[in-house]
């Protein structure tokens, strides 16, 4: 069936007076718990009711991936210095990948050393004013589904990441891929979608165990205000049973997990954190994305968190059309939208830069939040190494570069970071109306309306020098130097506008 037809169900559910600004004494920038709202006023908000924008990156250094070659590690060693470098790019959010396979390697026994590592990363990020989104990550179910030499595959499948071995039931199905399409073909292996079928059927209680593992981690992390929330499951696959049946199971899994995490938060006297939920990416091993029906929960503190790889992996829609489609789906849920993953990986960096600039325009115009894929990717990552472990690059560039030993080389992807590190409002008083920015000259324009006086916060890149301001109904109360730039605290009232420029 053409993919266009398969997307149809998704689509269906679908004057300014210029004044000079004065500068006063700087203020502290304390990180605080955020919440989400649904309905007419949807998105991320702080305790003062200001709309918050999150910009950041995915980070996999605590990941538990399949190893193709023992001499070529699949992840870079964890280093808190990464968070400092992220902060210098203006990032205020990191999507921190973790894996169930390391959290619960033995059934019913949670890896306290791993939980400590996760908590340390949360604390390290907090020192740089970075929010952490905890993401239970998986790709193609887990690292225990990998083709063996005796499988005699025409197209052998790398192992990936996700579930522990004890929760991997494949019915003896083939691990071989349908074709040589690389990453995009990993889910075509019958062993992968049989494993997901067992998960959604709760065979041997493995889905319950996964939910319990989430609750256990939430008890340990709910005390941190910089934990922005929990991403329930990365890119879930559906099984092989009838589509609507499987979609219903996805929704029930989300609902049960949200309830369990809420109980865990209450049990330790912690406030609620935002729940992030995604759309499925396959059914019967084929690229048939679908969404859970909107009635899976009445929880208000949730956000739709899809991934978009239009003009990167799929070309069915333009990246702008894809963004609009996903925004329409978030409207169906009456939630805010957070793009958990997106990226451009063309052989010509100039092509990727052009696409990223277009995405930036679309995102800014929608006051969007996102995390780019990804901070670092070693040559030994399953995305880059061959199945037999013999073919891999000497170096690998994501946003930073690593060598084949997994070490940071000191090189950065300056072309992409120049766009990703563009200035943006971190907290907006009142109702946002218009926002644009130019990563080439640092110019920023923001317009909003408020029925009470308040403060809007802007992060401004230092690349262009000290910023200048033209405001209507606004006054700069503080301009604080922070990592990578400036934090501008602007007192605003009524319908206001802020223009940032450089001389």
Describe the function of each predicted region.
Residues 1-8:
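Bacterial N-terminal signal peptides that target proteins for export
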Residues 111-118, 319-322, 352-357:
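Charged helix-capping and loop-helix junction motifs
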Residues 296-297, 305, 348-472, 481-503:
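Aromatic-rich peripheral "rim/lid" segments of glycoside hydrolase catalytic domains that contact
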Residues 18-30:
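Bacterial Sec-dependent N-terminal signal peptides
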Residues 240-347, 358, 364-368:
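Glycoside hydrolase catalytic-domain groove-lining segments
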Residues 36-54, 58-274, 279-290:
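Active-site mouth of glycoside hydrolases
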């Amino acid at each position: 069936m053409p993919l266009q037809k398969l997307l149809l169900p998704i689509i269906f559910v679908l004057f300014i007076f210029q004044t000079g600004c004065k500068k006063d004494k700087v203020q502290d920038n304390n990180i605080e718990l955020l919440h989400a709202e649904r309905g007419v006023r949807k998105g991320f908000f702080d305790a003062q009711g200001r709309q918050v924008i999150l910009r950041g990156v995915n980070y996999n250094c605590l990941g538990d991936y399949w190893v193709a070659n023992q001499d070529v590690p699949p992840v870079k060693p964890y280093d808190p210095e990464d968070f400092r470098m992220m902060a210098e790019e203006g990032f205020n959010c990191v999507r921190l990948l973790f894996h169930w396979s390391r959290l619960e390697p033995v059934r019913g026994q949670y890896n306290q050393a791993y939980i400590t590592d996760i908590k340390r990363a949360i604390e390290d990020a907090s020192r740089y004013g970075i929010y952490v989104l905890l993401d239970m990550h998986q790709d193609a179910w887990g690292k225990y589904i990998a083709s063996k030499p005796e499988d005699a595959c025409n197209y052998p499948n790398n192992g990936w990441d996700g579930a522990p071995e004890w929760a991997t039931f494949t019915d003896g199905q083939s691990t071989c891929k349908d074709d040589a399409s690389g990453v995009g073909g990993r889910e075509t292996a019958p062993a992968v979608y049989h494993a997901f079928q067992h998960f959604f059927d709760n065979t041997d209680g493995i889905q319950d165990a996964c939910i319990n593992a989430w609750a256990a981690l939430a008890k340990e992390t709910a005390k941190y205000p910089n934990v922005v929330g929990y991403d329930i499951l990365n890119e879930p696959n559906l099984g092989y049973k009838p589509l609507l049946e499987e979609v219903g199971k996805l929704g029930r899994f989300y609902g049960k997990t949200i309830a369990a995490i809420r109980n865990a938060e209450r049990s330790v006297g912690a406030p609620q954190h935002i729940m992030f939920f995604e759309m499925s990416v396959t059914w019967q091993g084929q690229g048939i994305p679908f969404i859970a029906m909107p009635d899976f929960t009445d929880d208000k503190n949730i956000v739709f968190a899809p991934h978009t790889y239009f003009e990167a992996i799929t070309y069915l829609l333009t990246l702008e059309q894809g963004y609009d489609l996903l925004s329409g789906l978030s409207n169906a849920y009456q939630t805010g939208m957070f793009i958990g993953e997106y990226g451009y990986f063309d052989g010509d960096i100039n092509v990727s830069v052009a696409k990223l600039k277009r995405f930036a325009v679309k995102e800014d115009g929608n006051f969007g939040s996102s995390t780019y894929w990804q901070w670092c990717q070693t040559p030994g990552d399953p995305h880059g190494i061959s199945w037999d472990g013999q073919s891999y690059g000497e170096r690998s560039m994501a946003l930073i570069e690593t060598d084949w030993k997994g070490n940071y080389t000191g090189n950065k992807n300056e072309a992409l970071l120049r766009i990703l590190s563009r200035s943006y409002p971190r907290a907006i008083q009142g109702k946002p109306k218009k926002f644009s920015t130019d990563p080439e000259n640092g110019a920023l324009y923001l317009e909003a309306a408020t029925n009470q006086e308040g403060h809007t916060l802007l992060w401004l890149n230092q690349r262009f020098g000290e910023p200048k301001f033209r405001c209507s109904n606004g006054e700069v109360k503080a301009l604080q130097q922070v990592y990578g730039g400036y934090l501008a605290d602007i007192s605003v009232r009524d319908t206001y506008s802020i223009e940032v420029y450089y001389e």
